[in-house]
Design a protein with these regions (language model features):
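N-terminal signal peptide c-region/cleavage motif recognized by signal peptidases
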Residues: 13, 18-19
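Secondary-structure transition/turn motif
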Residues: 52-57, 81-86, 123-127
Length: 159
């Protein structure tokens, strides 16, 4: 195996074998994957990885890669979140909620969910996703959430 193939293969093996992160603890497998991709991040108080993607044209988008994972039977997934709309914290306006439902139908990855005062695009990927798959899912979340932010709050780039 050539050296260029050995490093990604080793990272994938380590990521697949790593134990799940405890609440508030950053997942070392995600750290290794992001570091291998030269993606800059911060670890928040929950142990999640916060990334700001530069989307060009003066726009940026926040994305969180969750360290905690969920399981259903033998399927283990992690979530990637990106906010697309901020509301008053009580209820999402009906028109916005309906638009997000319509959007969820046409998305290739993810769907919209309410997290406190934010409408978040939540993408679920296998825990053993490769670094490239992790990056692709995070970029897809950022792109879709930013498009929704532009549609629902024209002229703003707060998220």
């Amino acid at each position: 195996m050539t050296r260029s193939l050995l490093v990604p293969a080793l990272l994938f093996t380590l990521a697949a074998a790593a134990p799940p992160a405890l609440a508030g603890e950053a997942d070392p497998a995600i750290k290794a994957q992001l570091d291998s991709l030269d993606i800059k991040y911060e670890v928040d108080s929950d142990g999640d990885f916060k990334i700001t993607f530069d989307l060009g044209g003066g726009r940026s988008q926040l994305v969180w890669i969750r360290s905690s994972t969920e399981a259903y039977g033998d399927l283990k997934v992690r979530e990637i979140w990106s906010p697309g709309y901020k509301h008053d914290g009580k209820q999402v306006p009906v028109e916005v909620a309906n638009r997000l439902l319509e959007s969820s139908h046409s998305l290739i990855l993810g769907g919209w969910t309410k997290q406190k005062e934010f409408c978040m695009l939540a993408v679920k990927i296998p825990v053993n996703a490769t670094p490239k798959q992790l990056r692709d899912a995070a970029e897809a979340a950022a792109d879709a959430a930013d498009e929704m932010e532009q549609e629902l709050t024209p002229g703003k780039d707060d998220l």
